[in-house]
């Protein structure tokens, strides 16, 4: 260990020191404040002179056992500066029941842990350019969560994680194909599912009429049968429209039938709607079933929902459905646990019925659950509201109270809705080059200072700035390389070209 000295004026937040030995950007050092207490700082800039090195240090805080507390007094001028021992840093970053995700960029021997409770309950985001290491980071997190019997639902739009495997995750991965029962959707969600745009008002009106009518008249219809009955009813209405007669449709608010006179113009609308449904059935028949996809999720597993092969409207509908019913069923479960002890007999009866249904069909919501959304910008776009953004937003705002966590993964940060992004209290930010992306992330991150923003463009693959509730202090971390199997790696193009000789 060598001697380094504070030079020039000091403050409570910054100081400068000189060293005759080489020093590195990002190193952790300790100096005394004027109260004689040890203060931890990180070197944010290094200038080399002919005879010495000059380091500019940002103060992190006063060392108080294994904690960091705010520094209230300036650094002692002309005092000694020393490198922080690995042991001190290890004690700071060690978190009971934490997730072991990597090491400090400047210290291979200092492991970095994320507080599991704070990461899940207060939500997180993994942000990066394409190829920056976000899929590797998500895989490492899933490995660590699996070690703790975590219940995770991973939304996988491109099938990157369906091959996910690690020996520590043996028996803890379940791949789920997106199958939905249309009876469980609201009419507007059903319209979205079959590809009716928000601006196609007339079509959406007839979808709602037909949906309520079939649900009332055919209460046992499910899956593809339910859709076909809607299609048949619309066909009957198209014949009525061609002659200008009235149709009868069920109104659930009045619990009775209403009538509507059709014009010949309605014939064109209805036939177009029938064509849309027919095309949907042709493309997505395998994604329609008579079970609730929430029933497929298992406690203590990484449940991977493989959305590859779906178009964006169908993806959004699936994700909105999952987010909505996870949150609502979890709320129902927790409320019923209390209501079952109510002095009111009817409240007790309803609560016990809810608990029986949940224990039989939706056991996943009996434990806290983490919903990780890959390609999150698809589902929470900055200038658009959809069913997915509505319910993911509710989880971001209210999920902490009910044990439903949210993780967002995206390579397009500025396309994420700022209200939802700002609710993620821990940010794992890998390489970000575009200044607009950097500023956008900074606006959504209270702890991301200007000094850390400047570091984002210079990060290597797998290196991340981590800030927020789940980490002891803002840090630059080298994320572990996931030593199992996952599908997010770049294709070795030249290797495959050169392998043509093997064919």
From Swiss-Prot:
ATP binds at residues 122, 131-136, 478-479. SUPFAM superfamilies: P-loop containing nucleoside triphosphate hydrolases. InterPro entries: HerA-like, HerA_barrel_dom, HerA_central, P-loop_NTPase. GO terms for molecular function: ATP binding; ATP hydrolysis activity; helicase activity. The keyword Zinc does not apply. The keyword Secreted does not apply. It catalyses: Couples ATP hydrolysis with the unwinding of duplex DNA at the replication fork by translocating in the 5'-3' direction. This creates two antiparallel DNA single strands (ssDNA). The leading ssDNA polymer is the template for DNA polymerase III holoenzyme which synthesizes a continuous strand; ATP + H2O = ADP + phosphate + H(+); Couples ATP hydrolysis with the unwinding of duplex DNA by translocating in the 3'-5' direction. Its EC number is 5.6.2.3, 5.6.2.4. It is an enzyme of class 5 (isomerase). Keywords: ATP-binding, DNA damage, DNA repair, DNA-binding, Helicase, Hydrolase, Isomerase, Nucleotide-binding. Involved in DNA double-strand break (DSB) repair. Probably acts with NurA to stimulate resection of the 5' strand and produce the long 3' single-strand that is required for RadA loading. Has DNA-dependent ATPase activity and DNA helicase activity. This is Probable DNA double-strand break repair helicase HerA. It comes from Methanocaldococcus jannaschii (strain ATCC 43067 / DSM 2661 / JAL-1 / JCM 10045 / NBRC 100440) (Methanococcus jannaschii). The gene is herA.
